[in-house]
């Protein structure tokens, strides 16, 4: 996977340490964690990254043991930090300056609501319509939490000088996220010292529907929606142009950076199978 790209993302990177197995025909309650040799697997990923000059990002969201993050940090694997989840102890959004450097930061992902969808509670409405809430009272609690989080986000933008008090008051009363606030959110996150920032087109275009809704199969059109603009139309789209200029000022390309020389050597595909075989 590293052969022709500059970066790879390891989904559920905790699987390098353990994976929850459920035997066929059994329930999740009957499953168990199967553990792997974390240091040995990281010791395979790291040299391959150097050899192919490919950055590695580990998707370390959810319940992740500290030892996994420590091992990945020692190997130079970037953490995966999302604005929605990065909070202070009291629930406020973590300021950009407090984000870690060895990480990729983003507002959201394909498995979470888009910025516009999060703002209007589109994800909560959808989960309610598909009966995905195990407890009916959970919807009410999450609606209350979401209302508080919208205010927390606006106040975070105001503290960074990206919105003034009048703009905060106006945005707080709007059901639909305006383009000015969308740009402010991305510029706020761009101030983080994190090495990489990722931007979703769905967030820039303020689309309410997320690409994938976990917990569904044929109940929801996962991975089947197209963006409303062609690449040519996107190039002249005002919101995208303004955001690109703003991000370019905050996170400019490194001066003097030269194109990476990709690895030209032929790498045999079964190498790692041999390395992990006890008789090798």
Predicted segments, located by residue:
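Catalytic cores of glycan-processing enzymes that make or break glycosidic bonds
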Residues: 1-270, 278-280
